[in-house]
UniProtKB/Swiss-Prot annotation:
Pfam families linked: Mqo
Family of this protein: Belongs to the MQO family.
PANTHER family on file: L-2-HYDROXYGLUTARATE DEHYDROGENASE, MITOCHONDRIAL (PTHR43104:SF2)
Protein name (record): Probable malate:quinone oxidoreductase
Catalysed reaction equations from the record: (S)-malate + a quinone = a quinol + oxaloacetate
Organism: Blochmanniella pennsylvanica (strain BPEN)
Disulfide bonds: none
First-level EC class: oxidoreductase
Cofactor(s) for this UniProt protein: FAD
Length: 515
């Protein structure tokens, strides 16, 4: 196909300015990872990334717009559900999240081996993951959770304690100044990690740019995606530097534009998006760089969300490693705006509303009134209120040491359930066109940590005829040694994989053992 062509398609005159095998919308961790997979699997494919901002990884992937937790379900209590009827703890989601993160680590280890990623410590470092609770009921839950998780080899090495001095040894900051009569408990997983997804994204894109078949266009705003009779897609773009309009014809489209994915998916007109809506929620964190405070805490400590609060509100006080510097952050504190992106438009929410999703979003609002009350309470919160919440995790806090930082926007999914009623769904979800040539990623956490599992899902949907070929299978096994296998329940494989990834990524290896 020539660079410029004029085609009469469905009675509309279209000026095709370029063509590609696949267009990736958004220059964040998802598109960068997808682009790297495709470059390895099909080096001759023409891959285009379009990003509306002047730099990549400036929205959810930016280091200041997420907490950097390598989500492995070691410390996040919302990945394990307590069943009041039989007093059991369901760990199925924790296992799924953990396996997904192990898959991401394998791919990163492979990229280190082939010199695509050169300095692992620039994007991943060991920071122990801890859960910390107080009160009789919460302590009971954490103990049951710990006992349930030990039934999986994936959580071998987790330690539980109710001893104040033991917990103080792990992280003095959360214990010093605390009432010694308070009932507390904690779990600790030494092999937890802190991940800089912004640095990882930048390194992937820097390597991709060496491929002559890869093109990245910054300050290019994708405004719509339209399908053609021949199963191709026209991606309509505005060059924000000169306001020129462009149209790119492509065989495949992936929309990895964070909060904007829903709006762009709606322009495609595919019926699969009918009924989907989005609910934007932002976040803020208290941050300190004071070395006297930072040195008292080397952990990501997750607590338990308050009653009626959503999963995304789980408070945590974290060590973060940014360009070699350690800082602490505490939060999140919810914010609300109608923007779907941090650098988005106030009209994003309103542009996403249509006849297919107005009813579902109203139903979800009625059914989640507790969430609305929670958001209101967060919006009227004063800085001293925030410090009071921090004091529950850091009893001797000095307010003058902490600064409030605004993080990124997340768009929670609203969709119809089996009863055709709109429900609020936390997490991430891939929406595909019927023929698999267009896919979009919607939702939020634990997205970035599970990026490679999501890409494998996309490959299976979009390139089903290729993923089962010997050529692709062999390459995928090279990239992900546990590909097609389950880690849970396989002690030998878990240790083999973890030893491999830890060696490559310069992380601490702890041998898993049978109970």
């Amino acid at each position: 196909m020539s660079n410029v062509a004029v085609i009469n398609q469905q009675h509309r005159l279209i000026k095709i300015t370029s063509s590609a095998d696949i267009v990736l919308i958004g220059a964040g961790i998802m598109s960068a990872t997808f682009g790297m997979f495709l470059t390895i699997l099909e080096p001759t494919w023409r891959i285009h990334i379009y990003e509306r901002l002047s730099q990549p990884a400036q929205e959810s992937s930016n280091v200041w717009n997420n907490a950097g937790t390598g989500h492995a379900a070691f410390c996040e209590l919302n990945y394990t559900q307590y069943n009041n009827k039989n007093c059991s703890v369901d760990i199925s989601k924790a296992i799924a999240v953990n396996e997904a993160f192990e898959i991401s680590r394998q791919f990163w280890a492979y990229l280190v081996e082939i010199k695509v990623l050169k300095y692992p410590s620039s994007f991943i470092n060991n920071v122990p993951h801890m859960s910390f609770v107080w009160g009789e009921e919460n302590v009971c839950f954490l103990k049951k959770r710990f006992q349930a998780l030990l039934n999986s080899v994936l959580f071998s090495g987790m330690v539980y304690s109710e001893d104040l001095q033991q917990i103080r040894q792990w992280t003095p900051l959360i214990i010093d100044g605390r009432n010694v009569s308070q009932k507390i408990a904690a779990t600790r997983m030494e092999m937890g990690t802190d991940v800089n997804f912004g640095a990882l994204t930048q390194q992937l894109l820097n390597e991709l740019k060496k491929n002559v078949n890869f093109k990245m266009y910054l300050q290019h705003d994708v405004v719509s995606v339209q399908n053609n009779n021949d199963a191709t897609w026209d991606v309509h773009v505005i060059d924000r530097r000169c306001k020129h309009k462009k149209c790119i014809r492509t065989n495949y489209v992936f929309i990895g534009a964070g909060g904007r994915s829903l709006n762009l998916l709606q322009t495609s007109g595919i019926p699969e998006v009918y009924g989907y809506a989005g609910f934007p929620v932002g976040g803020q964190f208290l941050v300190t760089k004071n070395p006297k405070i930072v040195e008292q805490h080397l952990a990501k400590v997750y607590g338990k969300a308050s009653v009626n609060a959503p999963p995304m509100s789980v408070p945590h006080i974290d060590t973060r490693i940014l360009n070699g510097e350690k800082i602490l952050l505490f939060g999140p504190f919810a914010t609300f705006s109608s923007k779907f992106l941090k650098y988005g438009s106030w009209l994003d929410l309103f542009h996403s509303l249509n006849k297919h999703n107005v009813i579902p979003i109203l139903q979800a609002g009625i059914d989640n009134f507790d969430l609305i009350k929670y958001l209101i309470s967060q919006l009227v919160m004063s800085n001293m209120n925030r410090i009071d919440e921090l004091r529950e995790y850091y009893p001797t806090v000095n307010p003058s040491d902490w600064t409030l930082v605004t993080a990124g926007q997340r768009v929670q999914i609203i969709k119809r359930n089996s009863n055709r009623r709109g429900i609020l769904q936390f997490g991430t979800e891939v929406v595909n066109s019927g023929d698999g040539t267009l896919s979009a990623l919607l939702g939020a956490s634990p997205g970035a940590s599970t990026v490679v599992s999501i890409i494998l899902q996309l490959l299976n949907t979009m390139f089903n005829n290729k993923i089962n070929s010997d050529v692709w299978k062999n390459k995928l096994i090279d990239m992900i040694p546990s590909y097609t296998k389950n880690l849970n329940g396989d002690l030998i494989l878990v240790n083999k994989i973890r030893q491999y990834t830890c060696n490559a990524l310069k992380l601490n290896y702890i041998e898993a053992i049978d109970r």
